[in-house]
Amino acid sequence: MRLFKSKEKLSESESVYLADIEQKIKAYKAKGYRVPTRKMIKTAAQIKGIRRSAAINTAVLDLVAAHIHEGMTTEEIDTLVYNFTIAHGAIPAPLNYEGFPKSVCTSINEVVCHGIPTPDRVLQEGDIINVDVSTIYRGYFSDSSRMYCIGEVSEEKRKLVQVTRECVDLGLTMVKPWNFLGDMAQVINDHARENGYSIVVEIGGHGVGLEF
């Protein structure tokens, strides 16, 4: 059975291209690798929807960057995220997901992830905070987080934030056709360890695109 089908007649170059993909996928599968199903390969319309969702998601983080400050509560960050997301025709994905009560995760200092915004937690000078935003736009999911330094932070915290950003940038260089997720994970892990850090292995990522 062919992995790729089309109701439209393909050009010769398109046929050769798809045949090449089929052969590569079959070869990987024969070696025991997990390979993408046809469902995982997105259509042009789906990619457009995912990109729109991601654009809103990024705009939320930019908005937080413009407003976050010492004395702000994490509840105020949550309100900011919720209002902006709804105003742009989208939905905050975390809200009520498996009982999560808020629209965003706010993780401060030693909190690894999934911190819950509250009216009692006030940002203080020297804090570092990760704001993790997930957006649903017309059924398409996007997710990204960003670190923010509140005022002057210690050199220890500054270095952690900087190296983490470098890890992300290195990981992105591995996101290309026929690479493995493990290629991305490897360069991130290597750079973190070279700088005296380690990866949080107990917590993995989650889906974006058509699933959360």
Q: What role is predicted for each listed range?
A:
Residues 1-212:
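Active-site neighborhoods and metal-handling regions in enzymes and metal-associated proteins
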